[in-house]
Curated annotation (Swiss-Prot):
Its EC number is 3.5.1.103. It comes from the Bacteria. It comes from Stackebrandtia nassauensis (strain DSM 44728 / CIP 108903 / NRRL B-16338 / NBRC 102104 / LLR-40K-21). Zn(2+) binds at residues 16, 19, 152. This is 1D-myo-inositol 2-acetamido-2-deoxy-alpha-D-glucopyranoside deacetylase. The lineage of its organism: Bacteria, Bacillati, Actinomycetota, Actinomycetes, Glycomycetales.
Length: 296
């Protein structure tokens, strides 16, 4: 299949519909607009346990009709359309794995909860995709799943396992020829960026950090020295915001990205950061010391 694909290929692995847009939306739109790059999104669950911010849809909740997953699948498709990502896939197919809910909740024990999925079995689904597409780049979360959600942590574990197994010619050869990903990234946010946002919103009625006294108290964010890569997706802010709006059940209209865009301009939402954990770093920007291209 790679004979018919562009020369550059990247796979993003996310836990739920809407996760693709917050931390990687501008990056995905930026590369999807490049005719020499093929972008694939793999999402692991339908997000059945999510909150609902549209009152008239409240009965779709897991505790009611339990139909939120199907609705969110529709939102996910609209989000991908906004980002220009045509190749979007559900790990194992839609509904193979269920949203596990927040840590230490009953949803963790659901028979189909992604949190309880057999790691090798789940990874094999991703191995098949990696061997089919043969991407140079794989992107997912850090070991804490960015902020500690069980499905984010499991998405990290599955991605790590799949990258290992995809390169092992002895593992499930029927899934395709072995393939080694050249560069493996985790999503992240540097504390300097959080500090800027913290200050920007400190006197705002729309403060997403309300009740937080320091960026060090947040469950995410790393020292700038840990960051290796920044993607400046300027020109793709409107695409990212359209992607955010597509997830209406999960992200209210007055979300912090929309507020930031209104306050300081849409381009402020398009800077996204990563940590390269496997592979060779590309040329660094002389000012930041960070590489500026996932494929460099």
């Amino acid at each position: 299949m790679t004979d018919t694909l562009p020369p550059n290929r990247v796979v993003f692995v996310h836990a739920h519909p809407d996760d693709e847009t917050i931390g990687t939306g501008a990056t995905m739109a930026y590369y999807a607009a490049d005719p020499d790059t093929h972008v694939t999104l793999v999402t692991c669950t339908l997000g059945e346990e999510g909150e609902i911010h549209v009152p008239e849809l409240s009965q779709l909740a897991a505790a009611e009709a339990d139909q939120l997953g199907g609705w969110r699948l529709h939102e996910w498709h609209m989000s991908c359309d906004a980002l220009g990502v045509a190749d979007r896939r559900m790990l194992g197919g839609p509904g193979a794995y269920r949203d596990s809910g927040m840590m230490d909740t009953p949803a963790n024990k659901h028979p189909r909860a992604f949190w309880g999925a057999d790691l090798t079995e789940a990874a094999a689904h991703l191995v098949a995709i990696l061997r089919e597409l043969r991407p140079q780049v794989l992107v997912t979360y850090d070991p804490n799943g960015f902020y500690g959600h069980p499905d984010h942590i499991q998405a990290h574990r599955v991605s790590v396992k799949a990258a290992e197994l995809a390169a092992d010619a002895d593992f499930r050869p029927e899934l395709g020829e072995a393939h080694k990903v050249s560069k493996f990234y985790w999503t992240t946010v540097p504390k300097s960026a959080l500090a800027t946002m913290f200050e920007e919103f400190s006197q705002s009625d729309d403060n997403p950090f309300e009740g937080v006294t320091s960026v060090d108290d947040l469950p995410f964010g790393v020292d700038d020295s840990e960051v290796t890569t920044v993607i400046q997706g300027k020109g793709f802010g409107e695409a990212k915001l359209a992607s955010v709006r597509a997830h209406a059940t999960q992200i209210p209209p007055d979300n912090w990205l929309a507020v930031m865009a209104a306050k300081v301009g849409v381009d402020a939402t398009t800077t996204e950061h990563y940590i390269l954990v496997d592979g060779k770093r590309g040329p660094a920007d002389p000012e930041t010391g960070w590489e500026t291209d996932l494929f460099a």
